């Protein structure tokens, strides 16, 4: 099976050669940054419909995590189009962070559709460097389908712990690698070099549960879920929470 991977990767590369040439010349990334929000605006509602009950179950736990202000200070890391807003309890003070500024107009639309929330600001920055946010300033951090595409999950989780107050909670929902040695994992390996370009850096074979377990949270609760959109090469999902 391992012998097949480089051969099939080469075949996929040849079939998508223009994309890889554009990436090599530096033309693809700006284009990807522009179109990716539109792609997410199409895919996330479909995913939300599939996972609605589980998301409501996960995010219903936010309600009791109010800070000194009497409201929940919530940071959505890699906020994208704001697809999670509908699941947050009323009164949350939401700060949005994403490295892609092209998401802002989609966020504006989501804000208008979710008046039960209080919006603080949109920060354009990578998760590895959230210096614009103060230490211990957040009661809750939400991270959904983000750790697959960051440069360093370890650094992102360090920053998450820094901005969370003591007792603050990270809620996560991430796709991860299929079981090692399975045919599904083999196909993830085959598609990953091309998928990273299509998906704005998204990696198919990350073992994100290990990063969470090694991030020095005081408590972690985690469960695995099947992928909501089975026609995509993304694997099973992990959902849960981690307490600082």
UniProtKB/Swiss-Prot annotation:
Q: How does this chain sit within the bilayer?
A: Peripheral membrane protein
EC numbers on record: 2.1.1.9
GO MF terms, alphabetically ordered: S-adenosylmethionine-dependent methyltransferase activity; thiol S-methyltransferase activity
Mind naming one GO cellular-component term on file for this protein? cytosol
Q: Is Transit peptide one of the keywords UniProt gives this record?
A: no
Extract the Pfam families matched here.
Answer: Methyltransf_11 (PF08241)
Q: Which residues form the signal peptide?
A: 1-23
Cellular location of this protein? Endoplasmic reticulum membrane; Lipid droplet; Microsome; Cytoplasm, Cytosol
Give me the reactions it catalyses: a thiol + S-adenosyl-L-methionine = a methyl thioether + S-adenosyl-L-homocysteine + H(+)
**Which biological process, per GO, is one annotated for this protein?**
methylation
What keyword terms does UniProt attach to this protein?
Cytoplasm, Endoplasmic reticulum, Lipid droplet, Membrane, Methyltransferase, Microsome, S-adenosyl-L-methionine, Signal, Transferase
> InterPro entries under this entry?
Methyltransf_11, SAM-dependent_MTases_sf, Thiol_S-MT
Write out the tissue specificity statement of the associated record: Expressed in the liver.
Q: Which family does it belong to?
A: Belongs to the methyltransferase superfamily.
Instruction: Cite any additional comment in the entry.
Output: Methylates drugs such as 7alpha-thiospironolactone, L-penicillamine and captopril.
Q: What does this protein do?
A: Thiol S-methyltransferase that catalyzes the transfer of a methyl group from S-adenosyl-L-methionine to alkyl and phenolic thiol-containing acceptor substrates. Together with TMT1B accounts for most of S-thiol methylation activity in the endoplasmic reticulum of hepatocytes. Selectively methylates S-centered nucleophiles from metabolites such as hydrogen sulfide and dithiothreitol.
Know the name of this protein?
Thiol S-methyltransferase TMT1B
Source organism per UniProt = Homo sapiens
């Amino acid at each position: 099976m391992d012998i097949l991977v480089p051969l099939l990767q080469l075949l996929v590369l040849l079939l998508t050669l223009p994309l890889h040439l554009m990436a090599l010349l530096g033309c693809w990334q700006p284009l990807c940054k522009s179109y990716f929000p539109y792609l997410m605006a199409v895919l996330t509602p479909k995913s939300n419909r599939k996972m609605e009950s589980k998301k409501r179950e996960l995010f219903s736990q936010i309600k009791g995590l109010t800070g000194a202000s009497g409201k929940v200070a919530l940071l959505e890391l890699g906020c994208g189009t704001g697809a999670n807003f509908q699941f947050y309890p009323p009164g949350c003070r939401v700060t949005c962070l994403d490295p892609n500024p092209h998401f802002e107009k989609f966020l504006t639309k989501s804000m208008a559709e979710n008046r039960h929330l209080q919006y603080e600001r949109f920060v354009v920055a990578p998760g590895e460097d959230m210096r614009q946010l103060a230490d211990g300033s957040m009661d809750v951090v939400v991270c959904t389908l983000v750790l697959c595409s960051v440069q360093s999950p370890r650094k992102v989780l360090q920053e998450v712990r820094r901005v969370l107050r003591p007792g603050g909670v990270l809620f996560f929902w991430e796709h991860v690698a299929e079981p090692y040695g399975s045919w599904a994992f083999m196909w993830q390996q085959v598609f990953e070099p091309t998928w990273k370009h299509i998906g704005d850096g998204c990696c198919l074979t990350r073992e994100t549960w290990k990063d969470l377990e090694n991030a020095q949270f005081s408590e972690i609760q985690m469960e695995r879920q099947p992928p909501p959109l089975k026609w995509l090469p993304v694997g099973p999902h992990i959902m849960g929470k981690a307490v600082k």
